[in-house]
Amino acid sequence: MDARPSRYHEVYARWQRDPQGFWGEAAADIDWFEKPKATFDPKAGIYGRWFPGGVCNTCFNAVDRHVNAGRGEQAALIYDSPLAGVKRTITYHRLLTETQVLGAVLRDLGVGEGDRVIIYMPMVPEAVIAMLACARIGAIHSVVFGGFAARELATRIDDAKPKVVLSASCGLEPGRIVHYKPLLDEAIALSQHKPDACLILQRPQVEASLVAGRDHDWAKTRDHALTHARSVYDCVPVAATDPLYILYTSGTTGQPKGVVRDNGGHMVALKWSMKNLYGVEPGETYWAASDIGWVVGHSYIIYAPLFHGCTSILYEGKPVGTPDAGAFWRVIAEHGVAALFTAPTAFRAIKKEDPDGKLLAQYDLAKFRTLFLAGERADPPTLEWAEKMLKVPVIDHWWQTETGWAIAGNPVGLGMLPIKHGSPTVAMPGYDVRIVDEASHEVAANKMGSIVVKLPLPPACLPTLWQADERMRESYLDEFPGYYKTADAGFKDEDGYIFVMSRTDDIINVAGHRLSTGGMEEVLASHPDVAECAVLGIKDELKGEVPCGFIVLKSGVNRPPTEIEKECIALIREKIGPVAAFKLAIAVARLPKTRSGKILRGTIKKIADGDRWTMPATIDDPVILDEIGSALKGKGLGAS
């Protein structure tokens, strides 16, 4: 644990006094082809733009600058795939060569500055190279999670209108191969917009059939470019305010929401975060156990670690089952990981399989300093279990696809603040976080309200949605004028610690009482036999809504589930009180989740309420929804 007094309050106050000076200073850590004319232009864009007049290139800052500075032989990426049985180390020098060559391939396929490229790929190094190659030539990448349903991919093709799609023959899941190419072919058949070309990486597990005239073999095309000395030697200078990428928010229905990330602000904020928030030094190994299809993968598998000159882990595997619940410990020990960033759901899975942490004893985690959790609410029992097992600080932090980096966290690099379980700690410099009521008035400490951020948002946050400025205003800015709406609800305590309790749509109204499902989940998760849980409001004729708790029991628990259900009901009554009207707990084998580990609460609610529902495109295993339906039926709920 860090014994130094934290510099956080001093640094945050400095940002408050002079936001432009603060970010102007941070911008000095980036290599610019032309320095920005100003730090911020409040008149540009929807709420202002960062670093106007600046000319830069994201790929240059992620790769070239490190090779130029003598870091070429350091590992940039370590690809570790228990699913493919492959490990590969890619140095900064090698990454530069591959990115230069793929940049030339993209140009030969007609991709120019400002053109869009969709990347529909598994967790392989070529996916990272693809993103960097787009950045190198000034193209805009849009990564779509590999294996995403064809219809969802088609809507993204129609929205982004890519010149080229980069894909692979397949992705790997435990015990099965996911064929990507048929999904891609179907998506292109469904979409109005047709890409000019597709570049397909043939993986050894499956060979995809190629469409003549449209599809190109990745390896052959790359090798041809290499042997003919085709490479984009220099990075294309782009404006700091030009888009780097579009990332569609998961689970959107109908017209997808394309979050735009710009080049300049993104580099400045992410580079700042590596040292100041995550406390990692250049040359150290950093591992974000996520997927490149999600924002965590974009920001902290690829861009931030590479901007900072770190070694980043690209892991194609799971927390459990590849081969066991010791998988994460093996990766940390083998590659000397200093900091791990993952979702709480991964640790709940490990805790369920190996509650006593027996597998941990097999590995030497001497270099491991910090565990960071984000992506969903981190329940205190999971945090406490991780602290007890790992004996390192376990830090919850909170952010969104839209922001690209932490809104709130515990800044390791500035000296840690005391941890309060259930809180992602405090607002990061750049974010003026307020808790407000429906009329945008700030509420008192410890009182629930909507969490908002006073405009302008800091560098790296979305300037807008792709070709949808009006939708940006409607979605995020209109409800609370002068603020960005996070759509999360929570409170701040007397020390300014932020507690994110639930999405605003997860606040349930029980007979006029506004109750947080997050608070109830915290209580259920404290039961010694509960591995994980979800609480949601279901329709009730008398009270409007009543809470219903779904609980997954730990491995090895052999008591009757009905007994544990009764204990859970009693526990909520004891800790929250009868006002919660919590009378329904249902033990289930597992909870339905998105591939990024978020529980599909909305879908469970629709099933429980007997409403019509559609299969979420992001679901990990559709069979689980049938199991939920059966469990509800057993309690006389859901569609009859």
Language model region names:
Residues 59-60, 77-132, 149-154, 214-223, ...:
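Conserved AMP-binding/adenylate-forming core of the ANL superfamily
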Residues 73-75, 198-205, 211-248, 255, ...:
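Conserved pre-ATP/AMP-binding loop-to-beta segment of ANL
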Residues 132, 136-220, 336, 343-344:
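Structural core segment of the AMP-binding/adenylate-forming
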Residues 144-169, 184, 333, 340, ...:
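AMP-binding/adenylate-forming catalytic core of the ANL superfamily
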Residues 196, 200-202, 574-599, 611-636:
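AMP-binding/adenylate-forming catalytic domain of the ANL superfamily
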Residues 216, 310, 338-342, 352-418, ...:
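Gly/Ser/Thr-rich phosphate-binding loop
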Residues 267-285, 295-339, 352-358:
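Conserved AMP-binding/adenylation subdomain of ANL enzymes
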Residues 426-430, 441-476, 515-517, 612-613:
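Conserved ATP/PPi-binding loop(s) of AMP-dependent carboxylate-activating enzymes
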